[in-house]
Amino acid sequence: MDSNTVSSFQVDCFLWHVRKRFADQELGDAPFLDRLRRDQKSLRGRGNTLGLDIETATRAGKQIVERILEEESDEALKMPASRYLTDMTLEEMSRGWFMLMPKQKVAGSLCIKMDQAIMDKNIILKANFSVIFDRLETLILLRAFTEEGAIVGEISPLPSLPGHTDEDVKNAIGALIGGLEWNDNTVRVSETLQRFAWRSSDEDGRPPLPPNQKRKMARTIESEV
């Protein structure tokens, strides 16, 4: 069993215990108490899966947390601020674009658009987004550009459905890449996106997608137009 899995469970058990003590003093509001109940069920399930006793894990988690706090400075307790990263210029973000063969898909709170008339092109994906804890926090806009600078695809949040995770963005990127590669385009991802939103890429910044996944993603986009 992976040691990180065990220690993560131990710390989660102890932190749940701290939150329970807080609730016992009638200090928690309704959402706090609701999360406490849901997390209790989750911890029981994880304990059964791992074969670990919750009480024993709580004691071990307490030792881990105490050790961390002994080494912690007041400066480290500050909540890190988000960073805004930009691949695109203001002109690239605001520029209008036209699709000869428009394809569109809504994936959760993200809208994926692409022009399936584009064939045999070298395409790069660029994005502007915020980052926290070295992971993508909020996507502002992602666009696909040809070497000539033409926009041929886009991923943007839907204003009516706010909120998305880095995993949502990664899945949307995969769908866009699959649709573009279906027409024999070569797609690569900017270094910034590779680092924070799409970690599984080859040396050229081109995410490896098996042929069957490319076909599935392309068909998915087509079926939802």
From Swiss-Prot:
Keyword Ion transport listed? The answer is no
Any GO BP annotation: symbiont-mediated suppression of host mRNA processing
> Which of UniProt's keywords are assigned here?
Eukaryotic host gene expression shutoff by virus, Host cytoplasm, Host gene expression shutoff by virus, Host mRNA suppression by virus, Host nucleus, Host-virus interaction, Inhibition of host innate immune response by virus, Inhibition of host interferon signaling pathway by virus, Inhibition of host PKR by virus, Inhibition of host pre-mRNA processing by virus, Inhibition of host RIG-I by virus, Inhibition of host RLR pathway by virus, Interferon antiviral system evasion, RNA-binding, Ubl conjugation, Viral immunoevasion
Identify the residue span(s) of motif Nuclear export signal.
132-141
Q: What is its main location?
A: host cell
What ranges does the record give for the region RNA-binding and homodimerization, renumbered to this chain? 1-73
* GO cellular component terms, semicolon-separated: host cell cytoplasm; host cell nucleus
Give the residue interval(s) assigned to the motif Nuclear localization signal: 34-38
Q: Where is this region: CPSF4-binding?
A: 175-210
Recorded superkingdom: Viruses
UniProt region (PABPN1-binding), positions on chain:
218-225
Q: Which GO terms describe its molecular function?
A: protein serine/threonine kinase inhibitor activity; RNA binding
Q: How is it modified after translation?
A: Upon interferon induction, ISGylated via host HERC5; this results in the impairment of NS1 interaction with RNA targets due to its inability to form homodimers and to interact with host EIF2AK2/PKR.
Q: In which compartments does the protein localize?
A: Host nucleus; Host cytoplasm
Tell me if RNA-binding is a UniProt keyword of this record: yes
Pfam family of the protein (one): Flu_NS1
Q: Region Disordered: which residues?
A: 200-225
Q: What is known of its domains?
A: The dsRNA-binding region is required for suppression of RNA silencing.
* Function summary: Inhibits post-transcriptional processing of cellular pre-mRNA, by binding and inhibiting two cellular proteins that are required for the 3'-end processing of cellular pre-mRNAs: the 30 kDa cleavage and polyadenylation specificity factor/CPSF4 and the poly(A)-binding protein 2/PABPN1. In turn, unprocessed 3' end pre-mRNAs accumulate in the host nucleus and are no longer exported to the cytoplasm. Cellular protein synthesis is thereby shut off very early after virus infection.
Q: Which HAMAP family does the annotation name?
A: INFV_NS1
- How is the quaternary structure described? Homodimer. Interacts with host TRIM25 (via coiled coil); this interaction specifically inhibits TRIM25 multimerization and TRIM25-mediated RIGI CARD ubiquitination. Interacts with human EIF2AK2/PKR, CPSF4, IVNS1ABP and PABPN1.
Report the family membership: Belongs to the influenza A viruses NS1 family.
Q: What is this protein called?
A: Non-structural protein 1
Gene assigned in the entry: NS
